[in-house]
């Protein structure tokens, strides 16, 4: 039987060092099984991998952190057209609670997105997660788009790598203040920053 989950909604500057330490450990345990490289950004007390979120939804239960979703408002470009979005990312859920699901996190974050006045929530997921996120699309919560390339800056400027990378990821769009029909058509999204 699962313990009761309670959500904490907080701005980034409300987190204490102890929160970052606990979150970093959560991400190392969550992302580590998918490869040591995926857990590496969370060494020490660093609780973000690429861009740092401005707002977090953190679920707790009797065992500690159960789930996390970060958001960051930013302007992206879709084939050159500017669009304000709230990027959703840095999603994680403890393995013993995987049935809690991303839909629960989105339901908690949606009122925050409405308060912030953004037209869309936006995120990317790797193609291997297509079946997982497609279920959410069937429920009308979001739309999954494929065939769109996404350009992002690297977190760090490195001497041996270009400053940007291009991914063929699945694009997840959550209509918030505008209908999905207002999402611009296009084949290239410029994130204009590091992935959340």
From Swiss-Prot:
It comes from the Bacteria. GO terms for cellular component: cytosol. GO terms for molecular function: acyltransferase activity. Gene3D superfamilies: 3.40.630.30. It is found in: Cytoplasm. Its EC number is 2.3.1.-. HAMAP family: NodA (MF_00084). N-acyltransferase required for nodulation. Acts in the production of a small, heat-stable compound (Nod) that stimulates mitosis in various plant protoplasts. Belongs to the NodA family. This is Nodulation protein A. It comes from Mesorhizobium plurifarium. The gene is nodA.
């Amino acid at each position: 039987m699962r313990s009761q989950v309670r959500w904490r909604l907080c701005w980034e500057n409300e987190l204490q060092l102890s929160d970052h330490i606990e979150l970093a450990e959560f991400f190392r345990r969550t992302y580590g099984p998918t490869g040591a490289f995926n857990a590496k950004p969370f060494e020490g007390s660093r609780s973000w991998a690429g861009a740092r979120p401005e707002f977090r939804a953190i679920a707790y239960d009797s065992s500690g952190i159960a789930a996390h979703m970060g958001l960051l408002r930013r302007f992206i470009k879709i084939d050159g057209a500017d669009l304000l979005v709230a990027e959703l990312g840095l999603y994680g859920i403890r393995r013993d609670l995987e049935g809690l699901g991303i839909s629960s996190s989105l339901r908690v974050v949606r009122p925050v997105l409405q308060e912030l006045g953004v037209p869309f929530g936006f995120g990317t997921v790797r193609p291997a997660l297509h079946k997982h996120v497609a279920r959410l699309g069937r429920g009308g919560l979001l739309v999954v788009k494929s065939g769109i390339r996404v350009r992002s800056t690297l977190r760090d400027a490195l001497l041996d790598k270009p400053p940007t990378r291009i991914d063929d990821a699945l694009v997840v769009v959550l209509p918030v203040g505008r209908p999905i029909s207002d999402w611009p058509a296009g084949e290239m999204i410029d994130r204009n920053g590091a992935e959340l």
